From Swiss-Prot:
Pfam families: Herpes_U26. Coiled coil: none annotated. InterPro entries: Herpes_U26. Its main location: membrane. The chain crosses the membrane at residues 31-51, 66-86, 103-123, 131-151, 183-203, 218-238, 243-263, 274-294. GO terms for cellular component: membrane. Keywords: Membrane, Transmembrane, Transmembrane helix. This is Protein U26. It is a multi-pass membrane protein. The keyword Membrane applies. It is found in: Membrane.
Length: 295
């Protein structure tokens, strides 16, 4: 029961932390130079978190306070808002990285993690926009309180013994890189299709919660190239007939393609000397950047 609860808590926090969501919203109406600065900040924050880091020495209360205070002050003078934005994106990246690693290390239940993500995403819908700060805080509070006990559990400590840093791996160039090429090529294909679809299907400003739900799916796998082909057909159909249904179909197939990549990556690389959690986090952050930037 405790393992099930911990899995749900991890999912609740993962659904609440979407790196760049609020930061990209703060760039609406800004100059191209300002938007480029945001992209550079996001890239630097991700690279700084993609490093060897022992989750046992992490205390989530610091990032919880930064995220909470940053979301409470969205309308500030430009200089102060830039500082808030930088602090927020760094905390979101670090928190998401830790959560991704913990899900890979712990013997967690994928359906429970997915359920937690679904609950968080539901409360991020537009009908709850006025309570977004409170909802985010409520979603992050359980992991903030529970984290200390979670990392001292026997399951976590046993899993941590298998979770070796990529830089210390002797087989990285021989095995892991070959596996990585396949996933990277598939991801770049879908990423390109997502970018093209975003430009030509005139996606409205929204939270894209349906798309994020499909991306986080853990129940269905689809051949990535079939998903890409169906997404391209949806783009062409949407260009010929301006119907909202084709945008939904497009998001569904692209999302299923991304989720299939992540599910295959988790099963293939989980027990190898590779930071699979970091790679999953990197893929997710790139998808979020493509979907939300410039909307």
């Amino acid at each position: 029961m405790r393992r099930l609860t911990d899995s749900f808590i991890l999912g609740l926090a993962k659904g609440a932390v979407i790196p760049g969501l609020y930061t990209f919203r703060m760039t609406e109406g800004r100059s191209p130079l300002g938007q480029i600065g945001v992209l550079i900040t996001v890239a630097i924050s991700f690279l700084l978190t993609f490093k060897r880091f022992d989750p046992r020495f992490y205390k989530p209360i610091g990032d919880f306070k930064i995220v909470f205070l940053s979301l409470m002050a969205p309308k500030l003078p430009s200089l102060l808002s830039a500082v808030v934005m930088i602090c927020l994106i760094f905390s979101e990246m670090r928190l998401r990285m830790i959560l991704s690693r913990c899900v890979m290390i712990m013997p967690s239940y994928s359906p429970a993690v997915f359920t937690g993500i679904m609950v968080s995403l539901f409360f991020k819908s537009q009908m709850f926009d006025d309570y977004s700060v409170l909802i985010t805080a409520a979603s992050l509070l359980p992991i903030t309180v529970r984290y200390g006990w979670m990392i001292r559990s026997s399951g976590f400590l046993l899993g941590l013994q298998k979770y070796r840093p990529i830089l210390k791996s002797t087989s990285f160039r021989e095995v892991d890189l070959k596996c990585l090429v396949k996933f990277t090529v598939e991801f770049l294909l879908l990423f390109t299709i997502l970018w093209i679809g975003k430009m030509f299907l005139s996606m409205p400003k929204s939270n894209h919660l349906f798309f994020l739900t499909v991306v986080n799916n853990v129940f269905f796998k689809l051949n990535v190239f079939k998903a890409a082909a169906c997404a391209v057909v949806a783009i062409l159909s949407g260009l010929m007939m301006n119907v909202c249904l084709y945008r939904i179909i497009f998001e569904a197939f692209v999302g299923l393609g991304f989720s299939s990549i992540m599910l295959n990556l988790s099963s293939d690389l989980k027990d190898r000397s590779f930071y699979a959690g970091d790679l999953l986090n990197g893929f997710f952050c790139l998808v979020v950047c493509c979907m939300y930037f410039g909307v």
